[in-house]
Swiss-Prot record:
Alphabetized InterPro entries for the sequence: ScpA (IPR003768), ScpA-like_C (IPR023093)
GO-annotated cellular components: cytoplasm
Function, as annotated: Participates in chromosomal partition during cell division. May act via the formation of a condensin-like complex containing Smc and ScpB that pull DNA away from mid-cell into both cell halves.
Recorded superkingdom: Bacteria
Protein's UniProt name: Segregation and condensation protein A
Annotated localization: Cytoplasm
Alphabetical GO biological process terms: cell division; chromosome segregation; DNA replication
Subunit structure: Component of a cohesin-like complex composed of ScpA, ScpB and the Smc homodimer, in which ScpA and ScpB bind to the head domain of Smc. The presence of the three proteins is required for the association of the complex with DNA.
Gene: scpA
Pfam families found in the cross-reference section: SMC_ScpA
C-alpha cells in the first residue's frame, strides 16, 4: 500500500485500517508483530494531507495508543515484557478481534438487505402523493437495518474514541434477553425517551453488536423508534406509546 496515495475515506475507522494492514501482511492477528504494525500505521498517519485532519481525529487517538505501546516495547529488553504493555497489547488485540466480528455481522446484514431488495413491491398508483425527499444520513424511525447500523456505529465510535487509551475494558458477559430487559428498565426509569449514551454504556464492540441487534428487534416489534434530526446529531431512542412490554 502506497502511503502517499492513501485515502482514509476507504476505511471505517482506525480498527478497520489496522485490520487492512494485517491483511496486507497476510498475517494472523495472534502472531502479528505489533511494533511493525504500529510503525506502518504511524507512517500513514504522518503523511495525511492537511485536508484530512478533521477526518483523522479518531485515527490520531489510535496513533497515540500505538506510540505509547511501541515506545515501551523499545525501551524494554526483548526477552522481558512489562505487565502494562502486555495488558495494552491484549486490549488492542481484543478490540481488533471484536471489530472483525462486527464486520462479519455487517456483512450478513448487507446480504439480508440484498435479498430484501430483490423482492418486488408494486408502486402506488399515484406516486407523487407518496414522494418525499429524504436524507439517507439521518434516522427517521423507518430506516433500514444498514442505515441504522452505520449511524449507530459512527455514534458509538464518536462517543468512545477519546477514551480508547484511558479505558481499561473488562470482560462483559451479556445476552440479548438481558439487554432487552435492561433497555425496558431504562424506559421505566427515564420515561419515553432514552439517550444514546445510556443504552450504549459499555465501550466494547461485542456489547454494541448485541445491543444493536436488540434495538433492531424492538424496532421490528414497534416497541421503539430511533430518530436523528441532523447528521452527527444525537440519536434519540423513543418508546412508542401504547405498546406494553412483553414479559
Amino acid at each position: 500500500m502506497n502511503k502517499f496515495e492513501f485515502n482514509l475515506e476507504n476505511f471505517d475507522g482506525p480498527l478497520d485500517l489496522l485490520l487492512s494492514l494485517v491483511k496486507d501482511k497476510k498475517a494472523d492477528l495472534f502472531t502479528i508483530d505489533l511494533a511493525d504494525l504500529a510503525t506502518q500505521y504511524l507512517e500513514i498517519i504522518n503523511h495525511l494531507e492537511d485536508s484530512n485532519v478533521d477526518v483523522a481525529s479518531e485515527y490520531l487517538v489510535m496513533a497515540a495508543t500505538l506510540i505509547h505501546i511501541k515506545a515501551k516495547m523499545l525501551l524494554l529488553n526483548p526477552e522481558e515484557e512489562d505487565e502494562e504493555i502486555k495488558e495494552d497489547k491484549e486490549m488492542l488485540l481484543k478490540q481488533l478481534i471484536e471489530y472483525q466480528q462486527f464486520k462479519e455481522v455487517a456483512k450478513k446484514l448487507r446480504q439480508q438487505e440484498s435479498i430484501r431488495s430483490e423482492i418486488f413491491i408494486k408502486d402506488p398508483s399515484n406516486y407523487d402523493e407518496y414522494y418525499r425527499e429524504t436524507d439517507e444520513t439521518l434516522l427517521d424511525g423507518r430506516s433500514n437495518s444498514l442505515s441504522l447500523m452505520n449511524t449507530l456505529r459512527k455514534m458509538f465510535e464518536r462517543v468512545h474514541a477519546e477514551n480508547l487509551r484511558q479505558t481499561k475494558i473488562e470482560a462483559v458477559h451479556v445476552n440479548p434477553e438481558q439487554r432487552i430487559k435492561e433497555i425496558r428498565d431504562l424506559f421505566d426509569e427515564f420515561g419515553e425517551e432514552v439517550d444514546f449514551a445510556k443504552i450504549f454504556n459499555v465501550p466494547t464492540i461485542t456489547h454494541f453488536v448485541i445491543t444493536f441487534l436488540v434495538l433492531l428487534d424492538l424496532a421490528r416489534k414497534q416497541e421503539i423508534k430511533l430518530i436523528q434530526d441532523k447528521e452527527f446529531g444525537e440519536i434519540r431512542i423513543i418508546k412508542i406509546k401504547g405498546v406494553e412490554n412483553e414479559q
